[in-house]
Amino acid sequence: MDDHKTASPPRERSYETPPAERPITDAEAARAAALSANEHIKIASGYLRGTLADGLLKHATGAISDDDGQLVKFHGMYLQDDRDLRAERTKKKLEKAYSFMIRLRIAGGVVSPKQWLALDEIARTYANGTLRATTRQTFQYHGVIKSNLKRTMQAIDAVLLDTIAACGDVNRNVMAATNPAQTGAHKAAYQLAKTISDTLLPKTNAWREIWLDGERVVGGEDEAVEPIYGKTYLPRKFKIVVAVPPSNEVDIFAHDLGFIAILDKKNKLKGWNVTVGGGMGMTHGETDTFPRTADVMAFCEPEDALKVAEAVMTVQRDWGNRKSRKNARLKYTIERYGLAAFRAEVERRVGRKLQDPKPFRFESNGDRYGWVEGEDGRHHLTLYLPSGRIKDVEGGPRYLSGLRRIAEVHQGDFRLTGNQNVIVANVPADRKSEIDALVAEYGLNLGVTALRRNSLACVALPTCGLALAESERFMPGLLTELEESLAAHGLQDEDITIRMTGCPNGCARPYIAEIGFVGRGPERYNLYLGAAFDGSRLSKLYAEDVAAKDIRATLDPLFAAYARDRQPGERFGDFVIRAGFVAKTINGPDFHDRTGALKAVA
């Protein structure tokens, strides 16, 4: 891949003047300014309390109020229902089969064996019997009913974990590089992620009051209760990652804020390149919404990284769009006011000028499977988890039971990756054989083909309320079909990134996959092609509203052309652009421009 050295050259255009005031926190003023409904909910919430405590006591329903449904996200939960059962329950005049998805906050994705065992027990006791590793280095539970919410949260708290700010208009879970070979750099990345996570955590006591029956803390001025966020928190979600080249397994260009480790020849940290303005979500048919890859804005010294993180987030707090949530992410803020103005304001808040970015190079955004020895002599085993779902498969791998057994004997830690996989980390050399025996006994090393190890899928149906099509449940069968097609053209060992989401919000980051599927409706998908293998370039729409049954037939001629006409070492995403099947996407606003994407497959 090309070296990434500087921010994208600015397009010649005029930008708006940034606002000079802090966000509106008065209810009357918010109404007069026509702020979004969520802003009113936050203002009236009493720092994220709302009526959640009372709603939990209403046993006649498995749901909570609509306003509390927005606030509970800040506590790490989404209200969902089983969409497979909707029609049947409606016919019987029953309430929807409500339950909650619970997402943990695990900075850097590191958990101890003790914590793993506790999380496993929670899954089997209160959730649907599975754990799900997410695309952002944490766990989700599905199927937790309202009456079990407090018990679940208290069990999570008992092993020194929580779900605070795992969702909502706040800084979300902070990701960090997991590359096990670069032990020192990984430690620096993890420490920065953990420090940022702790510093930017909401300070309201609402989570402990509601879920742990803690004593209510009397509120005061905004600066006392929430010194960073204030009463209205952020305009929208905010995601931070820390990467260590040459691996981009955290997909740094897909996030609001990123730190890229700049290392010397001895792999010692010199500082961080700072990226801003990435994000995946969009809305079908609305071209003023788009995914965007982050700009490489500047370089900062190690001691300034935390100040930069807080400055970037608070500029977004003050400048972000609070009228239209679809245009509220940092990517739109930078498009609206310009990168130069944004950097200048960040520097003003940091109190010093930042340096220009340093050269760096990413080579891939996938995981390194199997055993890897770190610089410190410890060993790390990366295991593939299909779509991140940790469960026992009948007649196949027993992920839940096998990882439970490993946790019972493991003396190191576990690391979740941004690709929905898990690393059994920090294993002494003399304990490798014990881990290998358990991996073999439970079949945990089965089915890791080239295509599967580069695949991601969101949960989608039946639990996600936003899903327009299947994803996790459909992906395995589709991969089998596409593997057959690739093998027919001698491409079975080619690494090609492939991702699927059930809606355009892009949780599995499909717009930076070489092959991306985005749900349009039941069994129908938009097909995107042409992203960079290292995650640094967006894809382009190749075919719209493709029936699920036609996906293989649509891609097979492209695989044939790739096998026949590719250049040495050429990646699939680069090939489809050079061959003229799709136009190259420069960045976000260019995403919807399909000019040049009209070549028919020979």
From Swiss-Prot:
Q: Which organism is it from?
A: Methylobacterium nodulans (strain LMG 21967 / CNCM I-2342 / ORS 2060)
Q: Which Gene3D superfamilies match?
A: Sulfite Reductase Hemoprotein, domain 1 (3.30.413.10)
For this record, the Gene Ontology CC terms, alphabetical, are:
sulfite reductase complex (NADPH)
Q: Which family does it belong to?
A: Belongs to the nitrite and sulfite reductase 4Fe-4S domain family.
User: Cofactor note, please?
Assistant: Binds 1 siroheme per subunit.
InterPro entries linked to this entry: CysI, NiRdtase/SiRdtase_haem-b_fer, Nit/Sulf_reduc_fer-like_dom_sf, NO2/SO3_Rdtase_4Fe4S_dom, NO2/SO3_Rdtase_4Fe4S_prot, NO2/SO3_Rdtase_4Fe4S_sf, NO2/SO3_Rdtase_FeS/sirohaem_BS
Record's subunit section = Alpha(8)-beta(8). The alpha component is a flavoprotein, the beta component is a hemoprotein.
- Which purpose does this protein serve, as stated in its record? Component of the sulfite reductase complex that catalyzes the 6-electron reduction of sulfite to sulfide. This is one of several activities required for the biosynthesis of L-cysteine from sulfate.
Q: What name goes with this protein?
A: Sulfite reductase [NADPH] hemoprotein beta-component
Q: Name one Pfam family in it.
A: NIR_SIR_ferr
Under which pathway is this protein filed?
Sulfur metabolism; hydrogen sulfide biosynthesis; hydrogen sulfide from sulfite (NADPH route): step 1/1
UniProt KW keywords:
4Fe-4S, Amino-acid biosynthesis, Cysteine biosynthesis, Heme, Iron, Iron-sulfur, Metal-binding, NADP, Oxidoreductase
